Design a protein with these regions (language model features):
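Helix-coil boundary and interhelical linker segments in multi-pass alpha-helical membrane proteins
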Residues: 1-7, 60-81, 112-118, 151-163
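Interfacial segments of multi-pass membrane proteins
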Residues: 43-48, 69-72, 89, 104-133, ...
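Alpha-helical transmembrane segments of multi-pass membrane proteins
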Residues: 9-14, 57, 86-90, 126-130, ...
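Cytosolic, membrane-interface loops and tails of multi-pass inner-membrane proteins
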Residues: 19-49, 178-198
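Short, non-helical or kinked segments that cap or interrupt transmembrane helices
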Residues: 28-38, 95-108, 135-143
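N-terminal signal-anchor transmembrane alpha helix
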Residues: 1-24
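C-terminal ends of transmembrane helices
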Residues: 18, 23, 89-99, 126-133, ...
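Loop-to-transmembrane alpha-helix initiation sites
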Residues: 136-143, 156-167
């Protein structure tokens, strides 16, 4: 039973909603802008409306997977595994030859269900950094780190800390190119008219 739920978590996380939404506009989102299927690239190429749909669904993917796992009474180990499986599915989708997004929105979904207060705090910190710096990547990476620190400070259960740590590491890994561009001063800011590879 647990293995089946784990597999379904990965498969649901693998649904490339950004690709599907872009196809409604006759656009292959993997071939425009950064090539990423996430909300940021959708916003830059299709506008805020489609981007918000993609953002909402990607958050939903992470949240519903963990919610159902909790409702099924799964152990802490499998709760953490299902949350991470959903994000891994988004990042390495079986429907996209194991390519995908960067997992930020899906991670937010899992955090909001796992610990709503910490999840909201993480969103506030991430959005705040994005607003101040206009770097989506900086807000994403710092948000991932902040989630771990907030859980540790709040003294929350170990499985939540382990899950958040795994999510943060995945976010840092998928943003490694962004980090290098931040260091080099070539990262694109939110709202910048000039396209840059993301």
């Amino acid at each position: 039973m647990q293995i089946l739920v784990l597999l379904l978590s990965y498969l649901f996380g693998s649904i490339p909603i950004g690709l599907l939404i872009a196809r409604l506009y006759n656009i292959d989102i993997t071939k425009v802008g950064s090539g990423n299927i996430g909300a940021t690239n959708i916003q830059r190429n299709l506008g805020w409306g489609p981007a918000l749909v993609v953002l909402a669904f990607d958050i939903f993917k992470g949240g519903i997977v963990l919610y159902l796992a909790k409702m099924l009474g799964m152990s802490d180990f499998y709760l953490a595994a299902c949350a991470l499986a959903a994000v891994l599915g988004h990042n390495y989708s079986i429907f996209l030859k194991f390519k995908g997004g960067k997992g930020v929105a899906t991670s937010i979904g899992t955090l909001l269900v796992m610990n709503p207060l910490i999840g909201l705090g993480t969103v506030v910190i991430a959005v705040g950094i994005m607003y101040l710096t206009r770097f989506v990547s900086a807000g994403s990476m710092m948000g991932g780190i902040a989630a771990v620190l907030l859980l540790l400070y709040h003294g929350d259960p170990l499985w939540q800390v382990v899950t958040a740590t795994g999510l943060a590491l995945l976010i840092l890994w998928t943003h490694r190119d962004n980090f290098q561009r931040l260091q080099a001063g070539t990262e694109r800011r939110l709202g910048s008219p000039k396209e840059a590879k993301k």
